[in-house]
Amino acid sequence: MHPIKLCARSPRPSSKKRKRPAAAAATPPESEPEPVHNTAACNSEGENNATGKRREHNNKKMKEEKSKRKKKQGEGKKGSGILTDKLFSDLPISDLTANAIRDMNYTHLTEIQARSIPPLMLGSDVMASAKTGSGKTLAFLIPAIELLCRLRFSPRNGTGVIVLCPTRELAIQTHNVAKELMRYHSQTLGYVIGGIDLRGEAEQLAKGINVLVATPGRLLDHMQKTKSFKYECLKCLIIDEADRILEQNFEEQMKQIFKLLPRQGRQTVLFSATQTEKVEDFAKLTFGSKEERQRTLVYVGVDDHESKATVEGLKQGYCVIPSERRFLVLYAFLKKALSEKTKVMVFFSSCNSVKFHAQLLNFIQIECYDIHGQLKQHQRTSTFFKFHKAEHGILLCTNVAARGLDIPDVDYIVQYDPPDETKDYIHRVGRTARGDNGKGSAILFLLPKELQLLIHLKAANISVSEYVFRQELVPKLQPYLHYDSSFEQEKIVGGNYILNRSAKEAYKSYLLAYKSHSMKDIFAIHQLDLTSVAASFCFSEPPKVNLDLESSASKHRKKRNVNTGRRHGIGPSNPYGRKGSDDRRQFARF
């Protein structure tokens, strides 16, 4: 197989043109006369020319932006990609919602929207699944908003619709989509998520939030603690990314939420990207017995007969890279991506790994954003919106950004650390090639001993090609990253206390994540070459770490509390101490 020069590949197909920089678009031709800075001396002809040029430039810019929006939303391309030939204008919805959809530049429904909106409008319980980026958010929001509009819901009625999301970022994104849909409606909208002041949210709930977007833990907190939270008139409960909610150990919280919520007269909706056994079990809890579900539940499975688990516009590949060269390959790839002004998301297995690589890359002038679970909520939200608005850039993240987030124009998904399960792979790569005719590429980094993962991907209808990096593309950066005693000068990581400490924490977290991987037959920690792994974290030799997963600070404290907490072991049951109990010669009893 001939080596593929992957990082030199064009980030987008030639048919998809990137918008020219504003500075280049506004550059005047050489024949244009010098501008007159004294406005009082300008004649009418010069003013008209300048005004005409500005108007022409503004019109051109508006046309470019409109063309970009049309291309993104697939306007005028009925029946292509994921869109159908059905129009939003044909739906039996209010003029208020129709006008909002028109403002959002949507014209044609996607498959999941065309199949799920009609039964939802009729009030049926729906359990739906579709690939990521297929338009599920609009599919459940439009009927829910229309329901409250028909009932003339007002703040005094309390909460009529609850949308549950697994992550804070997805909740904020869903809230923003609902805000656009409800711009002409009188109903109120809000969200409650972790990381934000509980008292401030309680004050908003007391005023009455008709459509509430929430994460399960924070919703349960308010249901149990906020007395002014009115949800007795709840008409619709929507659970988005139901499979992910169950993965994040929200199952017990969900059971408590279901006990507290009114069941009679409530429509229940489950949306997910994959159908798993846990989702089926969750459906039993949500919709009742099998007989009851068969009688009342409408199941919409858009991808049930699809031969591929991912979208058509996605190019997928993997690279077999030894541990010691992983960071060097990533560095070369990201440096090329920056020069080509592409948008890249890189997934890691732990928060500490994201923190270290973000610090290191920014230190060596590869600017990047980072999102992980250890950041405060305002930092996560700010970073998400910065990357969302950016035309190009790099985002390092954990699986917290792998589900539901709709970030426009992502060119590459790099899975630096392999996913824990095949469905995690699907959701990670789902951040690119979104929408109708979306294009993107996904690259998976694998060690030589991890190639059996491809068998699991193939069993899940995921087809990936092998990419080979040419060695000359990888910079000779390794000697300058770790501290080498053979040199008399400090290196980047070895000589920087913060980077060195961060690298140790990332190294330990990587090994812990590897040890807890669900596919232990493939990801076996005892097969790792720790020296090579340490080299990928910029160490010349493996740092000493404790890999006992069962150990914790509390357990150590409990051990120390034995015999009244004294290390010498002296206590009521053993007055002679730890040594004295085994050595009769040390103490004599009289």
Swiss-Prot record:
Record keywords: ATP-binding, Helicase, Hydrolase, Nucleotide-binding, RNA-binding
Catalysed reactions listed for this entry: ATP + H2O = ADP + phosphate + H(+)
Any one GO molecular function term: RNA helicase activity
Entry domain remark: The Q motif is unique to and characteristic of the DEAD box family of RNA helicases and controls ATP binding and hydrolysis.
Domain of life the protein comes from: Eukaryota
Short motif (Q motif): ranges: 86-114
One GO process term, biological-process aspect: maturation of LSU-rRNA from tricistronic rRNA transcript (SSU-rRNA, 5.8S rRNA, LSU-rRNA)
Top EC category: hydrolase
PROSITE patterns for the chain: DEAD_ATP_HELICASE (PS00039), HELICASE_ATP_BIND_1 (PS51192), HELICASE_CTER (PS51194), Q_MOTIF (PS51195)
Listed name of the protein: Putative DEAD-box ATP-dependent RNA helicase 51
Residues that, per the record, bind ATP: A130, K131, T132, G133, S134, G135, K136, T137
Region: Disordered, residue numbers: 1-81, 549-590
Gene3D superfamilies noted in UniProt: P-loop containing nucleotide triphosphate hydrolases
Lineage per the UniProt record: Eukaryota, Viridiplantae, Streptophyta, Embryophyta, Tracheophyta
Name of a matching Pfam family: Helicase_C
InterPro entries: DDX18/Has1_DEADc, DEAD/DEAH_box_helicase_dom, Helicase_ATP-bd, Helicase_C-like, P-loop_NTPase, RNA-helicase_DEAD-box_CS, RNA_helicase_DEAD_Q_motif, SPB4-like_CTE
GO terms under cellular component: nucleolus
Residue ranges with Basic residues bias: 554-569
Composition-biased stretches (Basic and acidic residues): 59-78, 579-590
Residues covered by the Helicase ATP-binding domain: 117-293
CDD domains membership: DEADc_DDX18, SF2_C_DEAD
Keyword Hydrolase tagged: yes
Compositional bias ranges of the Polar residues kind: 40-51
Motif annotated as DEAD box, chain positions: 240-243
